[in-house]
Regions:
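Glycine/small-residue-rich loop that forms an oxyanion/phosphate-binding "nest" at active or ligand-binding sites
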Residues: 1-3
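Exported/periplasmic ABC-transporter solute-binding proteins
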Residues: 5-166
Length: 166
């Protein structure tokens, strides 16, 4: 979860999302269905784990507690927090890690399991894995590129940026 630097609302986890003073940013359920569904499934799973009724992200009626992105959530989420339209955004770990690295004076993050520098996601977290393959024979450089993507060097780079490889 991405939050404003200093955590002015004292958010510590999913249980705080039911507080009346907390506004949540989520990706758009109609235009970014994959990320939206992943985030909602993660929130639902984490809420069940914590025994919290967190029905508002999936309620039919618009809710003032939820600020939805309009186009590209990975650009809009940090902006919504800085603009004061949201207090917390559920985003992929690698995105929150990037925001805290490029804007360390603006953002903090709350991992949903483990620590920021050593995440241990709870089983309820939806985790996306990256896959690569060739179409046909991959052309002149396809197999070399696939070998490169499968190398230890690239795994280290992925890991540094909070990404997992299948």
């Amino acid at each position: 979860m991405l939050i404003k630097k200093g955590n002015p609302k004292n958010i510590s986890g999913v249980t705080d999302l039911i507080r009346e003073d907390i506004r949540l940013f989520l990706s758009n359920p109609e235009t970014e269905t994959v990320s939206y569904q992943g985030y909602v499934n993660t929130l639902s799973g984490m809420a069940a784990r914590e025994n919290v009724d967190l029905s508002f992200p999936t309620d039919e009626a618009p809710d003032t507690k939820v600020c939805y992105g309009e186009q590209i959530h990975h650009r809009e989420a940090p902006q919504a927090i800085i603009d004061g339209r949201a207090d917390v955004a559920v985003v992929y770990y690698h995105l929150a890690l990037r925001y805290t690295r490029i804007f360390p004076a603006l953002f903090d993050m709350i991992p949903l399991g483990g620590a920021i520098d050593h995440p241990q996601p709870f089983p309820e977290n939806v985790i996306s894995l990256s896959h690569a393959g060739l179409i046909g024979d991959g052309g002149q450089w396809g197999s070399c590129f696939l070998d490169f993507l499968s190398s230890e060097s690239v795994s280290i780079i992925y890991s540094h940026h909070g990404l997992l490889r299948a």
